[in-house]
Amino acid sequence: MSDTIAAIATAHGVGSISIVRLSGERALEFALKLSHKTKLTPRHATFTKLFNQNNEIIDEAIMIYFKAPYSFTGEDIVEFQTHGGFSVSEVLLEELVSLGARLALAGEFSKRACLNGKMTPLKALNIQDLILSKSALAAKIIARNMQGNLGELLEKIRTDLVKTLAFVETSIDYADDDLPSDLLEQISTMCEENSKILKEIYTLSQSKKGLIEGFKIAIVGKPNVGKSSLLNALLSYERAIVSDIAGTTRDTIEENFKLGTHLLRIIDTAGIRESKDVIEQIGVALSKKSLEDADIILAVFDASRVQDKEDEKIFDLLANTDKKIFWILNKSDLENVFKNTQNKNFIKLSAQKDITLLKEELQNYLNSFDSEGIMVSSLDLINACKISSEAIFRAKGLLEESSLEFFAFELNLAINELARFTKDFQRDEILDEMFGNFCLGK
């Protein structure tokens, strides 16, 4: 990490300011050359003109110097706050490269922070998740994770496992020295407790992932019951074509919208019915796939039409699902001839007039999800918790069978999985993969 890296840290586009970030051994040297200054006071904002090597002015900017190790990366960092737009920051970046800086790779600033002990990979993932969060609630949950509770918990579990492994491997090396029965009991209890904690983390994260990622809602029903009208009403704008002709929607339509603090992704599906039309058949297949992927289902029926076999097929399709279903009787402002033979608790509404009741029911359901507790958004970390929990559980069984070598193997597996997200992990190839999806300049 002897080279000095540079990147634009703000999003591309027109704005009031743009920030160019510089990190490495020569960061201060380059900043002094650009500004014609002889020194910079750490952590002080300095207003200055910036010049290229032909002594032509680039911009007037604010420059802040963070002296190592008291910086984001643990190296010398200089941040330039220039005027915004597409050009100025690009010109400054080109000038830094001509002085000897290298363009940073995606996530390289965060990677250097991890390698220099300024943060754990878990903290870096939380920062990236916060940047990409799509709702106020998601940002709140991720910000809470950043305060260290999850990182401290994983580090404690990893430390417990390492200490236990040391005892067991010593016993393996000195076969004549059996582990005392009281110590075996303590180890067994430790395994049971830590396996349970990790299982709770990944099961909670899976069951409540909609709080962070957004809940997926699929609208389903036979053709021409008002599914597209309902989609438009929820979005508050005309997104889908509304027609009296059955089968108008042949593909799924997906859009995001917010209800309170919750992000929702709503999917309007093609009407489900028997059809000889090949394109419509494909649409129906996509509709059924959307139901599998959805967290919530809005099952729509037409109050102005007598219940028929196509309605029955919708009931049958949803009979064995464990997903939350809102049963909706649309067009309830018209003469109601639909017979509720299934005794469903229908929400009666008119999608073209008022869906307030549906919004209230949805809001109440979403608010019933407790946002407290440790929730993980990273699929990689969820899988690591699952693998570790299962390995520790297996290790406990092997301990009871006195299979210490296999016990040590399982414990090592759990330790290595958790270590990828804690302060002791330093393997460059895994960090490269982890930070490859980060923003440039982060």
UniProtKB/Swiss-Prot annotation:
Cofactor note: Binds 1 potassium ion per subunit.
Matches recorded under Gene3D superfamilies: P-loop containing nucleotide triphosphate hydrolases, Probable tRNA modification gtpase trme, domain 1, tRNA modification GTPase MnmE domain 2
Residues bound to (6S)-5-formyl-5,6,7,8-tetrahydrofolate: 21, 79, 118, 442
Record bears the keyword Metal-binding: yes
Pfam families (alphabetical): MMR_HSR1, MnmE_helical, TrmE_N
Cited NCBIfam families: mnmE_trmE_thdF, small_GTP
Entry-linked PANTHER family: TRNA MODIFICATION GTPASE GTPBP3, TRNA MODIFICATION GTPASE GTPBP3, MITOCHONDRIAL
Classification via HAMAP family: GTPase_MnmE
Protein name (Swiss-Prot/TrEMBL): tRNA modification GTPase MnmE
Organism: Campylobacter jejuni subsp. jejuni serotype O:2 (strain ATCC 700819 / NCTC 11168)
Organism taxonomic ancestry: Bacteria, Pseudomonadati, Campylobacterota, Epsilonproteobacteria, Campylobacterales
